[in-house]
Amino acid sequence: MDFTKTMNEYVQAAEAAVARYLPVPEKRTAFIAEAMNYSVLAGGKRLRPVLMRVCADVFGGCPEEMIEPFMAAIEMIHTYSLVHDDLPAMDNDQYRRGKKTTWAQYGEAIGILAGDGLLNYAYETAAKAFDYAADADDMKRIAEALRLLASKPGIGGMLG
């Protein structure tokens, strides 16, 4: 097994899943969706969605269409944390990975809203896995995964 080749395949699959679930800018909220997408597409290793896919494969598998919404969601949650961490009230970073941070590109208020939007949209995205549930067991597994995902960005996880 060629580790580099396999890892690149996982990263490409993660990139595709993330891109597939990005919010589509609509007239009323186009500026927020644009800032959200800018943030998510700013680069990165995509380690979290790759690890999620690998774990799903190792521990019994899961249909691709059921795991992909969670892969995108976990990357959105990670990105939300970076967007908020870069804000002037936190680290005041103006560049990340050689690009302007979200608040530096769009302004502080839009940076806050983009981060908030990513966190909320992550749950909406993960819930799309229910569309692919084949039976009650799938529904239970998705509900448990969603509960676990929702518990980690808050006070019992990233904030605690």
At which residue positions do the language-model features occur?
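N-terminal amphipathic/basic leader segments beginning at the initiator methionine
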Residues: 1-22
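Mg2+-dependent prenyl diphosphate-binding active-site environment of isoprenoid biosynthetic enzymes
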Residues: 22, 26-160
